[in-house]
C-alpha cells in the first residue's frame, strides 16, 4: 500500500512575531509594505501578520488603525493566506469579552482579510475551543 504524501505547508510569522519579540511590536505598516510582494511570491501557505499584541501596539504606540493595516496587508498578499493570533475569549485584549463581542470581532477580522485564526487561550477553556467554529 502506497503512503499518501502530503505537502509541507509553511506559515511565516515574521510580520507578527519577529518585531513583537525583538522590538516590542513597533514595526509600522509602512515599514512592512515594501517586502509584501516578495513574500507573496515565496509560496507560503500563510503569513501570520495580525493579532497578539499587534492590535494594541498599532493603536497605543504607533497611532495606526489596525484594521487599515490588515486591509493593506490583504491588498498586498494576492496569493498567500493571512493568519492572525487570537487570544480566545480575550480577543486581542487583556480581559475576557462576552461571546457576542468575540463572535463579532471574528466576523470583522474575516471580512477585513483574515483567512486563518490561530487560537491560544491562557487557561485552555473548553468553551473557547467549542466556540472557535464561528
Where are these regions (language model features)?
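Glycine-rich, proline-tolerant flexible connector loops at the mouths of alpha/beta enzymes
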Residues: 23, 45-70, 88-94, 120-127
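General structural feature for long, well-ordered alpha-helical segments within catalytic domains
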Residues: 7, 28-35, 43-46, 65-69, ...
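N-terminal amphipathic alpha-helix/helix-capping segment at the start of soluble metabolic enzymes
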Residues: 1-23, 70, 75
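N-terminal active-site wall of soluble small-molecule enzyme domains
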Residues: 61-72, 76-86, 92-112
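Catalytic domains of carbohydrate-active enzymes, especially glycoside hydrolases
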Residues: 31-53, 108-116
